[in-house]
UniProtKB/Swiss-Prot annotation:
Modified residues (Phosphoserine): S172
GO biological process: peptide metabolic process; proteolysis
Requisite cofactors: Zn(2+)
CDD domains: M3A_TOP
Residues given in the record as Zn(2+) binding sites: H473, H477, H480
Compartment(s): Cytoplasm
Name under which the protein is recorded: Thimet oligopeptidase
Function summary: Involved in the metabolism of neuropeptides under 20 amino acid residues long. Involved in cytoplasmic peptide degradation. Able to degrade the amyloid-beta precursor protein and generate amyloidogenic fragments. Also acts as a regulator of cannabinoid signaling pathway by mediating degradation of hemopressin, an antagonist peptide of the cannabinoid receptor CNR1.
Cofactor: record remark: Binds 1 zinc ion per subunit.
Enzyme class: hydrolase
Keyword Cytoplasm: yes
Family: Belongs to the peptidase M3 family.
Catalysed transformations (reactions): Preferential cleavage of bonds with hydrophobic residues at P1, P2 and P3' and a small residue at P1' in substrates of 5 to 15 residues
Length: 687
């Protein structure tokens, strides 16, 4: 396929000189965090006061739009220094101080977003300035500020504005508390070795012990997922699954009810019928009806596949109960799902996950992953020895453009769990790559935070294949942050439409299902041998194992999210239980409240969880149309991808970027085929 002409340009901003400074620091005490928070608020407010005091005739690009853009750059960096430690600091005092800083700064963010005087100056500027006199991205920035002002109700009566401001402040604090509760949860369950039957020795040996010599199983991912997949004792799985979905049940249940109520109230004040419609106005989908149709149609297509998969699982369960002398209850329980889905992979596809992970030691995976990304995107990574970091496990890398040697950014890797740390895997943008006040380009800096199994004195960290996939995905977000060359902080990195933001990373997950990349990031941890070809072939074929059930569960989560944000009276636990039964065909465990543990609902994905599936339409199309056709390790396609999809950040609409990269409008064919569904006139290898 001939590459789109628009993708052939330079992937770097060659005009602006680059400032190589890392402005981040991680040595602040709790007291310093508190003091600097107050200082940052005062400094930033002074700029807003200055903009808000301009007379109509004096308003200009320099004293209004550029002043706001410049303060956004410095404020974003300083804010991240103060509020990021709540997720990663080994010190509880620092985490607490950082959380308090986040609360104060979130309240301040609301105050600044509701500055009617500043909004009026932006409106005056728009009326005054000739649109073609602004650079395209500056014009987009101006339009975005006007749009955000209206979405904050700054065109409405003052009384309404005050109500909206009050609600926004409450929402910020509730979201922080919701996720803090989950991060700080230290629940563990004690079990005997017999109760943990089926789990490998390296897992059992890594567990801490209680005073009576029982093994401590926490509810963090490195314990929860392996246990649900491998433990053959149903009662143990039941206890752990139930505890996992009861985390922070009382406190987060109350927070979630209040979040939903306040979001609906705010959206009505702004003239939207539901919170979902308010949120989706800024996304590719635009309305809740479009999302509902997308999810309903996909569910209908996947349900027959889900029924077939449930029948297979039920038969596996019946046979195992007979073999182990256990009573067969004739149904699939929530705590059975991951266990038997894993068995499907091991029996139907003959993929032995315990054997497979021996080929994925962390150091080898990291070396291979970094090598692939460097080759694919024309980059060069270098470890910075002795860098200032927040914990000894953390590493910092410098990233350069391979062709020019120009520094474009840095990234931190924080890959292992510890108490009080953020419990999932995520990329945090810490220093936006954009233009500074003096016109120089600020390098982008991001952190990948994960919770992979930590090495012990006896064994290295060995990754499950799905953890390798997670690693690839989150590192894709890091690359999006670093390769973006936007002028404004507001459009830097992953600041794209929320239902597109996952697409660049999802597309890069495909590399962990292709033979050549897999061989490059694997090696047996003892013998150094490559994955046997037979095991590799089985792994690749297993990609569509359980695809019906897995994606139906994603639809359940997306529909719960939509229901809560379109029907304010919906009870979260009841709605989740209803959808589990109706769509997945597997009941939720009685007494649990999964939505109270669903961090996305309070983490910026409200009414937007559907975006994971929606984004996959584009990620599948990009991969199959370009990389699969022209070479999965093609540096040429990789550079087109970097130029068309990563370079713009949010300075272009996603639909424009996609059309440039694909050479046409996106299609659903590759997405549907990737789910194991038939597409008329389309064969899987060709689409």
């Amino acid at each position: 396929m001939k590459p789109p002409a628009a993708c052939t340009g330079d992937a770097l901003d060659v005009v602006a000189p680059c400032s190589a400074v890392n402005h981040l620091r991680w040595d602040l005490s709790a007291q310093q965090i508190a003091e600097l928070t107050t200082e940052l608020i005062e400094q930033t407010k002074r700029v807003y006061d200055c903009v808000g005091a301009q007379e109509p005739q004096d308003v200009s690009y320099e004293n209004t739009l550029k002043a706001l853009a410049d303060v956004e750059v410095s404020y974003t960096v300083q804010r991240n220094i103060l509020d990021f430690p709540q997720h990663v600091s080994p010190s509880k005092d620092i985490r607490t101080a950082s959380t308090e800083a986040d609360k104060k700064l979130s309240e301040f963010d609301v105050e600044m977003s509701m500055r009617q005087d500043v909004y009026q100056r932006i409106v005056w500027l728009q009326e005054k300035v000739q649109k073609d006199s602004l650079r395209p991205e500056a014009s987009r920035y101006l339009e975005r500020l006007i749009k955000l002002g209206r979405r904050n109700g700054l065109h409405l009566p003052e009384e309404t504005q005050e109500k909206i401001k009050s609600i926004k402040k409450k929402l910020s604090l509730l979201c922080i508390d919701f996720n803090k509760n989950l991060n700080e949860d230290t629940t563990f369950l004690p079990f005997t070795r017999e109760e943990l039957g089926g789990l490998p020795e390296d897992f059992l040996n890594s567990l801490e012990k209680t005073e009576d010599e029982k093994l401590k199983v926490t509810l963090k991912y490195p314990h929860y997922f392996p246990l649900l997949k491998k433990c053959h004792v149903p009662e143990t799985r039941r206890k752990v699954e139930e505890a996992f979905n009861c985390r922070c049940k009382e406190e987060n249940c109350a927070i979630l009810r209040e979040l939903v109520r306040l979001r609906a109230q705010k959206s009505r004040l702004l003239g939207f019928s539901t919170h979902a419609d308010y949120v989706l106005e800024m996304n590719m989908a635009k309305t809740s009806q479009v999302v509902a149709t997308f999810l309903d149609e996909l569910a209908q297509k996947l349900k027959p596949l889900g029924e077939q998969e449930r029948a297979v699982i039920l038969e596996l369960k019946r046979a195992e109960c007979e073999q182990r002398g256990l009573a067969f209850d004739g149904r699939i329980n929530a705590w059975d799902m991951r266990y038997y889905m894993n068995q499907v992979e091991e029996t139907r596809y003959r993929v032995d996950q315990n054997l497979l992970k021996e080929y994925f030691p962390m150091q080898v995976v990291t070396r291979g992953l970094l090598g692939i990304y460097q080759e694919l995107l024309g980059l060069s990574f270098q470890l910075e020895e002795g860098a200032a970091v927040w914990h000894e496990d953390v590493a910092l890398y410098a990233v350069r453009d391979a062709a020019s040697g120009k520094l474009i950014g840095k990234f931190y890797l924080d890959l292992y769990p510890r108490e009080g740390k953020y419990g999932h895997a995520a990329c945090f943008g810490l220093q936006p790559g954009c233009l500074r006040k003096d016109g120089s380009r600020q390098i982008a800096i991001a952190a990948m935070v994960a919770n992979f199994t930590k090495p012990t004195p006896d064994a290295p960290s060995l990754l499950q294949h799905d953890e390798v996939e997670t690693y690839f995905h989150e590192f894709g977000h890091v690359m999006h942050q670093l390769c973006s060359q936007a002028e404004f902080a507001m459009f830097s990195g992953t600041h794209v439409e929320r239902d597109f933001v996952e697409a660049p990373s999802q597309m890069l997950e495909n590399w962990v299902w292709e033979a050549e990349p897999l061989l490059r990031m694997s090696q047996h941890y003892r013998t150094g041998s490559s994955i046997p070809q037979e095991l590799l072939d089985k792994l690749i074929k297993s990609r569509q194992a359980n695809t019906g059930l897995f994606n139906l569960r994603q639809i359940v989560l997306a529909k719960v999210d939509q229901a809560l944000h379109t029907q304010t009276a919906a009870d979260p636990a009841k709605e989740y239980a209803r959808l589990c039964q109706e769509i997945l065909g597997v009941p939720a465990t009685p007494g649990t409240n999964m939505p109270a543990t669903f961090g996305h609902l309070a983490g910026g994905y409200d009414a937007q969880y559907y975006g994971y599936l929606w984004s996959e339409v584009y990620s599948a199309d990009m991969f199959h149309t370009r990389f699969k056709q022209e070479g999965v390790l093609s540096g040429k396609v990789g550079m087109d991808y970097r130029s068309c999809i990563l370079r713009p950040g949010g300075s272009e609409d996603a639909s424009v970027m996609l059309k440039l990269f694909l050479g046409r409008d996106p299609k659903q064919d590759a997405f549907l085929l990737s789910k194991g569904l038939q597409v008329e006139g389309c064969e899987p290898p060709a689409c």
